[in-house]
Design a protein with these regions (language model features):
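Flexible, glycine-rich terminal cap/loop adjacent to redox cofactors
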Residues: 14-117
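Rossmann-like dinucleotide/flavin-binding elements
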Residues: 1-7, 68, 109
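Flexible, acidic loop-helix segments that line cofactor/substrate-binding pockets
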Residues: 2-18
Length: 117
C-alpha cells in the first residue's frame, strides 16, 4: 500500500514548550477568503497542567464561520505533541465544531483543554 507523503500535516515540533499545529492558520484562512471564528483556551485553566506545574501555553482552533468545519489548530504547551493528533483527525475529516464539542475528555488530562474550545 503506497501513500503520498504530505509534509504540511506533520503536526509536531519537539521543543520546550511543545508545539503542535495542523491545517491552516488564521492569516492563510483569511487570504483564502474564509469567514472564520477563532477559539482559544489557556492551560492556566487546565487541571492536569496545574498538577504538573506547567500551565503556560494555549490551544487554538480556526473554524469556518459559515460551515462550522474546523480548518486548523495550534497548540503550544504541555502535552501538545499528543493532543494535536486529535485535531489532525478533525481537520482531515472536516469535522464540524458542534460535532467536536460532543467529544468527552477524561479528567484530569491535558487534552481536556480541547473541551474548552
Amino acid at each position: 500500500h503506497r501513500t503520498e507523503f504530505d509534509q504540511p500535516e506533520i503536526p509536531v515540533v519537539f521543543s520546550n514548550p511543545a508545539i503542535g499545529s495542523c491545517g491552516i492558520k488564521e492569516k492563510e484562512a483569511k487570504e483564502k477568503g474564509f469567514d472564520i471564528e477563532v477559539k482559544k483556551a489557556f492551560f492556566k485553566a487546565n487541571p492536569k497542567a496545574k498538577i504538573e506545574g506547567d500551565d503556560s501555553g494555549f490551544a487554538k482552533i480556526i473554524v469556518c464561520a459559515n460551515s462550522g468545519v474546523i480548518l486548523g489548530s495550534s497548540i503550544i504547551g504541555a502535552g501538545a505533541a499528543e493532543i494535536i493528533h486529535e485535531m489532525v483527525l478533525a481537520v482531515e475529516k472536516k469535522i464540524k465544531i458542534e460535532e467536536f464539542k460532543g467529544i468527552i475528555h477524561a479528567h484530569p488530562t491535558f487534552s481536556e483543554i480541547l473541551s474548552s474550545l
